Amino acid sequence: MEAPAAHDCRNPQFSELSRFWELEPGTDCGTFGIRGYKPISLSWIGSDSVNTLPSSPAPNHTATDPVAYTTNEARIQLSVRTKIAQGLLTHLETARRDSLWFGYTQQSNWQLFNGDISRPFRTTDHSPEITYIYPLDAELPGGWRLRYGGLTLVHQSNGQSEPLSRSWNRTIVSAGLATGNDYVIKGELWNRLFEGEGNDDNPDISDSVGRAEITGLWNIDRKYTLGVVLCFSL
């Protein structure tokens, strides 16, 4: 078998996790190139209720005029990242490479089917982040291998002013496990950064969105992946 070509983050001879985070020199595609990050999607969302009058325990953060939103809407998510540095702590190693990334994710809920109020965007959330990834290769039971550990600082905001302003900051500790290219498990545990009572838009947001997340992926083949995401309010 020929050795994997250098500088190719799409080379199938490397594992999916190694290519995604460019954990080895052979998976390196350089810095400041645009990569995909979280799923880029257009989906239909339905529920049995919708929040027409957003409120928060924070003072002056409760809407006064309800909006006639409907329970069916479209959701659009865009997400990209770029590697801004590499080899920070592994510059003397030849088999693995750490990296620093900047990512941006935008998710919009669009009242596409609500012609009565001119189909507005109900909300758009912006999430810039900085992530450091350190490559690992520890054997685990059942043929699993611990492939990386990570630390992320992320800000999330809806970009609005009071009383609808909602934002928070958190640090995330993450890790990724894999069995070859077939199955991947990614875990995240986060801690919200304290903002002070006068600046906190969402005092109880952790009770709603959780404090940890586990993602399981089955790579059916090179084109298709089946995944499930579990969130926990610890």
Where are these regions (language model features)?
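Cleavable N-terminal export/targeting peptides
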Residues: 1-20
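Outer-membrane pore/translocation modules
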Residues: 54-63, 70, 87-222, 229-232
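Acidic/polar low-complexity segments with low predicted structural confidence
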Residues: 36-58
